[in-house]
């Protein structure tokens, strides 16, 4: 294992709390606040392309208005390693969404490839890349609905 330098327990817990907070906000109609979890130079990469912090803020405002969409994210297999002063993370995810047919089957399965940096004593996302492995078409369709301002 080249350059394998796992994080200490405290760092792991703090970053896992950051990840959980992001997903909680997405799943509980608080997407308009997710931009706060990024560094000033933070970016999100996914079905909508690359979004900086301000673009994420605008996206979140649209998504938060779509209160009839229900989603739940489940994560596991969290791998966190030091990379200089930042931490690199790989998080396996499973997303359910009621706009996916049938809603009891995952809308998307994949991984979040992330980088984290501590700013003013708090861990924040520097980069968050959403990489669907299964269900990529469903993820892209959902992103298009949010962009268009539609709910279902």
Stretch-by-stretch model annotation:
Residues 31-95:
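A solvent-exposed, acidic/Ser-Thr-rich amphipathic alpha-helical stretch
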Residues 73-75, 107-112:
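Short, surface-exposed coil-to-beta transition loops
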Residues 88, 109-141:
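Short beta-strand edge/turn micro-motifs at domain boundaries
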Residues 95-99, 118:
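Beta-strand elements of well-folded, non-transmembrane domains
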């Amino acid at each position: 294992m080249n350059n394998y330098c796992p994080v200490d327990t405290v760092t792991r817990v703090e970053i896992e709390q950051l990840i959980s907070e992001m997903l909680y906000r997405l799943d509980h109609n608080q997407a308009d606040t997710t931009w706060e979890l990024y560094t000033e130079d933070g970016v999100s990469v996914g079905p909508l392309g690359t979004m900086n912090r301000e673009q994420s803020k605008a996206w979140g405002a649209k998504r938060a208005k779509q209160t009839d969409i229900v989603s739940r994210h489940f994560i596991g297999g969290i791998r966190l390693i030091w990379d200089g002063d930042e931490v690199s993370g790989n998080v396996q995810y499973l997303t359910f969404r009621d706009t996916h047919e049938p809603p009891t089957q995952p809308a998307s399965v994949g991984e979040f490839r992330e980088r984290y940096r501590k700013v003013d004593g708090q861990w924040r996302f520097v980069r968050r890349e959403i990489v669907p492995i299964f269900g990529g078409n469903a993820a892209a369709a959902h992103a298009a609905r949010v962009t268009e301002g539609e709910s279902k």
